[in-house]
């Protein structure tokens, strides 16, 4: 406590030095900074926010109100959200603001519940989200310098902000909405460039669209170099840090860049992110609560990142360098679990908050009920190779050398690369990616015989066998673009040449695969079992690997039972790695042999009681029924999430 008192004394010094700014105009709603007394003013009255992060793009719209109400009942008076550009503009000029993408409705819903909103519209957001929220199609300009004053980048950003920010303007606090502050960029000091022209460009565009009086801010880590590049005059500089940080040092660093004004931790970490193959990250409730208490005792404004993490459905997860993709779950060990459940951490933080602010009275919405629907048998349907006419109805693109995903306008998912072996490989011959050009994972086969896997940065050579003229296929998976640091220009596919022995492989056929359309529209026309020359050859595949294959099954939820359907979790006993859809909804990636995530969250709104629910699994390596009957090939619905880490090896799985 003496340290807190000493820091408080240091921080009060500017009261004698500052000049009064941000005076209240009683005729309108205002949210301003009182630089004289180091605080925010809301409608002229002192105000301190206690906020939590929630990402609308990681929580189904069906559950927005439930999660927001739980946040309010914890004592929060504000929520913070990013806006993920690529979530709204998946293809250039084609915008989606409906359904789960309706950010305006999300913000309005927070307003209706009495929550203020701290908006972080990027354009870059990090967030462990694919490419940090930047759309992959920006990479069609191969030399583009992202997050800079590169003219190509600024032109795209300018157009996007011209679409997004006018939608946000009516939702600003001054206009009757809940948005009190708006962040410019995101932790820009951590990026390779220190481009003040870029920040000034954003500052001007935000003012153009939102007004000169909007309160703009930046966020950077507690490091002087980071703040030097991330802060800009006219943008209020805030910091972010984790439990256990020295508060005196952290806030004095903010004071170096903002001598007066409120103390703000824009990202106080309640947990941490996961990577495939690593232990599930946890942070003790005691540590989070202790530091939160001390920050609130100082009068600081705090946003807890995350208050609920949510889910990276489909292909939306990001990755870090050295290449480490994040899993489907973004649980984050947050106060509300991935499924929105109340945790011990939730109540620990609520107890701290109520010492400093009024916590709403009344019942807290309970954790949603979960149901274990049990095991569901799946039948083998088709391999990816056998379904090419459905997955790529327009046929392949031909090129002497490999093309990237961006070259063929495939932004997510999978591309199959095909060529012919130029010579006999009777003895095992190295298929190599000398420049680690497989981004990110290639499932290799010769004439329908699975050979093994090439993996970015870890497995760059694989011995294969086959006759001259045999078909060499590589199904390449985009496992998520890098979302942080200097490597966010993350091209996918075969980004450099492959060699067989000493020869460069040429004359490729490239199949961009539309998995979503095939799963949603053509499932019933796929026919029965595999057929053709592949069948005989598959018997000789290495036992660890098989061709990437689709499996399908159905299960029925009784319609006469009250409160069904309910949320559930799906697990994959005996399966290896792949993608799963339920009723056409892409739940995301499973990889139980790597962990730590063993189950995938299944929200109730994608389930039905009127007809059977259809499960489609794309197993990329080896299914439990690969060598046995379909009765061995099951998935299981359970009522609790499971996280654990399995020992991994660089050469397998």
Swiss-Prot record:
EC number, as in UniProt: 3.2.1.23
InterPro entries: B-gal_1-like, BetaGal1-like_ABD1, BetaGal_gal-bd, Galactose-bd-like_sf, Gly_Hdrlase_35_cat, Glyco_hydro_35_CS, Glycoside_Hdrlase_35, Glycoside_hydrolase_SF
Residue stretch(es) of the prosequence: 23-27
Disulfide bonds: 194-229, 625-633
Keyword Iron set for record: no
UniProt-recorded Gene Ontology molecular function terms: beta-galactosidase activity
UniProt-annotated location(s): Lysosome
Keywords per UniProt: Disulfide bond, Glycoprotein, Glycosidase, Hydrolase, Lysosome, Signal, Zymogen
Lineage: superkingdom: Eukaryota
Cited PROSITE patterns: GLYCOSYL_HYDROL_F35
Pfam families associated with the record: BetaGal_ABD_1, BetaGal_gal-bd, Glyco_hydro_35
Annotated residues for binding of substrate: 82, 128, 186, 332
Protein known as: Beta-galactosidase
Annotated gene: GLB1
Function: Cleaves beta-linked terminal galactosyl residues from gangliosides, glycoproteins, and glycosaminoglycans.
Gene Ontology annotations of biological process type: galactose catabolic process
Keyword Signal: yes
Residues at the catalytic site: 187, 267
Known catalytic reactions: Hydrolysis of terminal non-reducing beta-D-galactose residues in beta-D-galactosides
């Amino acid at each position: 406590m003496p340290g807190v008192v000493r820091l408080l004394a240091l921080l009060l010094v500017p009261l004698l030095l500052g000049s009064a700014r941000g005076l209240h105009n009683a005729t309108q709603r205002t949210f301003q900074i009182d630089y004289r007394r180091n605080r925010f003013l809301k409608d002229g009255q002192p105000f301190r926010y206690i906020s939590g992060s929630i990402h609308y793009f990681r929580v189904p719209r069906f559950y927005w109100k439930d999660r927001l109400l739980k946040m309010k009942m914890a004592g929060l008076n504000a929520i913070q959200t990013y806006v993920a550009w690529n979530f709204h503009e998946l293809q250039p000029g084609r915008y989606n603001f409906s359904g789960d993408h309706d950010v305006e409705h999300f913000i309005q819903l927070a307003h209706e519940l009495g929550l203020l909103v701290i908006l972080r519209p990027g354009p870059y957001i990090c967030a462990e989200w694919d490419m940090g929220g930047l759309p992959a199609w920006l990479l069609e300009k191969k030399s583009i310098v992202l997050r800079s004053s590169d003219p190509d980048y600024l032109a795209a950003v300018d157009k996007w902000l011209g679409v997004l920010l006018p939608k946000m303007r009516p939702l600003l606090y001054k206009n009757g909405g809940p948005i009190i502050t708006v962040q410019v960029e995101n932790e820009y000091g951590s990026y390779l460039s220190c481009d003040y022209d870029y920040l000034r460009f954003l500052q001007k565009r935000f003012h153009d669209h939102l007004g000169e009086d909007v309160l703009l801010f930046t966020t950077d880590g507690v490091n002087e170099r980071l703040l030097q590049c991330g802060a800009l005059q006219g943008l209020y500089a805030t910091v972010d840090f984790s439990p256990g940080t020295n508060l005196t040092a952290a806030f004095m660093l903010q004071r170096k860049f903002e001598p007066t004004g409120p103390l703000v931790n824009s990202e106080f970490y309640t947990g941490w992110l996961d990577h495939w193959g690593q232990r599930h990250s946890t942070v003790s409730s005691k540590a989070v609560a202790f530091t939160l208490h001390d920050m609130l005792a100082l009068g600081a404004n705090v946003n807890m990142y995350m208050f609920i993490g949510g889910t990276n459905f489909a292909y939306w997860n990001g990755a870090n360098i050295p290449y480490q993709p994040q899993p489907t779950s973004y649980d984050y060990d947050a106060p509300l679990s991935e499924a929105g459940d109340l945790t011990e951490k939730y109540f620990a933080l609520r107890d701290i908050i109520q010492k400093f602010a009024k916590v709403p009275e009344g019942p807290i919405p309970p954790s949603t009920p979960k149901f274990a629907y049990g095991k569901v048998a799946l039948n083998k349907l088709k391999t990816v190779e056998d379904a090419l006419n459905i997955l790529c109805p327009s046929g392949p693109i031909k090129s002497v050398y490999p093309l990237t995903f961006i070259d063929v306008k495939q932004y997510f998912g999978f591309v199959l690369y095909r060529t012919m072996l130029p010579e006999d490989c009777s003895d095992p011959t190295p298929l190599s990616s000398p420049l680690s050009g497989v981004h990110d994972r290639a499932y290799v086969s010769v004439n329908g015989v699975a050979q093994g896997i090439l993996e970015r940065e870890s497995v760059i050579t694989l011995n294969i066998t086959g006759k001259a003229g045999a078909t060499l296929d590589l199904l390449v998976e985009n496992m998520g673009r890098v979302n942080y640091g200097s490597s966010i220009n993350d091209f996918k596919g075969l980004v450099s040449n492959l060699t067989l022995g000493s020869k460069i492989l040429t004359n490729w056929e490239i199949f961009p695969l539309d998995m979503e359309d095939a799963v949603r529209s053509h499932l019933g026309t796929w026919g029965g079992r595999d057929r053709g020359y592949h069948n005989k050859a598959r018997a000789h595949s290495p036992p660890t690997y098989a061709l990437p294959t689709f499996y399908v099954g159905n299960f029925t939820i009784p319609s006469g039972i009250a409160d069904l359907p309910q949320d559930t979790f799906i697990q994959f006993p005996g399966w290896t790695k792949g993608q799963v859809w339920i009723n056409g909804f892409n739940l995301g990636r499973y990889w139980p042999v790597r962990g730590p995530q063993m189950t995938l969250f299944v929200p109730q709104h994608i389930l039905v009681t009127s007809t059977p629910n259809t499960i489609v699994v794309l197993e990329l390596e080896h299914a439990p029924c690969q060598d046995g009957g379909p009765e061995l090939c099951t998935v299981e619905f359970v009522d609790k999430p499971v996280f654990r880490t399995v020992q991994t090896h660089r050469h397998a799985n």
